[in-house]
Amino acid sequence: MDIDPYKEFGSSYQLLNFLPLDFFPDLNALVDTAAALYEEELTGREHCSPHHTAIRQALVCWEELTRLITWMSENTTEEVRRIIVDHVNNTWGLKVRQTLWFHLSCLTFGQHTVQEFLVSFGVWIRTPAPYRPPNAPILSTLPEHTVIRRRGGSRAARSPRRRTPSPRRRRSQSPRRRRSQSPASNC
């Protein structure tokens, strides 16, 4: 089963994968940032937002994974321990870093701004070097007026806009109208 944990937030795992691996801060820095900015909301009993819930879950997963690594480290050789730690940091650790970065950024800058950044960066990175601007988009400097047009989706989510007239029907498909005859047309 292929589960995309970012789908409900209007983003996708694919968009986050456009960002280079070294883009995401160290896990300790992300955990410290989460604690410094949102400790009350994360430890409180009230449900604040889906982003807070996702951060809580990521922190719990990382804590359990750290316990497992500690237990395994005590019962293995140095070489095996290094291999395990490297593997965890490059797989699960990366996913936790991506998750924490995404949700912390959504809380800090707004979900819409983060989506704009991911799309802008994805376009920038896929554009061949000779045709793209020298500097990549930066999350904190995105203009607020940037508009993302979604493909498909529900019409209720879109802002109201003027309807474009539909193309004209061919005469054979349009209903026939009878003209009332005026007295002048009888001549």
From Swiss-Prot:
Descriptive protein name? Capsid protein
Q: At which residues is Phosphoserine found?
A: S159, S166, S174
Q: What is the lineage of its organism?
A: Viruses, Riboviria, Pararnavirae, Artverviricota, Revtraviricetes
Fill in the subunit field for this protein: Homodimerizes, then multimerizes. Interacts with cytosol exposed regions of viral L glycoprotein present in the reticulum-to-Golgi compartment. Interacts with human FLNB. Phosphorylated form interacts with host importin alpha; this interaction depends on the exposure of the NLS, which itself depends upon genome maturation and/or phosphorylation of the capsid protein. Interacts with host NUP153.
Which sequence ranges form a coiled-coil region, renumbered to this chain? none
Post-translational changes noted in the entry: Phosphorylated by host SRPK1, SRPK2, and maybe protein kinase C or GAPDH. Phosphorylation is critical for pregenomic RNA packaging. Protein kinase C phosphorylation is stimulated by HBx protein and may play a role in transport of the viral genome to the nucleus at the late step during the viral replication cycle.
Family under the similarity heading:
Belongs to the orthohepadnavirus core antigen family.
sequence repeat segments run: 159-165, 166-173, 174-181
Gene Ontology biological process terms, A to Z: microtubule-dependent intracellular transport of viral material towards nucleus; symbiont entry into host cell; viral penetration into host nucleus
Give me the ranges of the annotated region 3 X 8 AA repeats of S-P-R-R-R-[PR]-S-Q.
159-181
> Coordinates of motif Bipartite nuclear localization signal in the sequence?
162-179
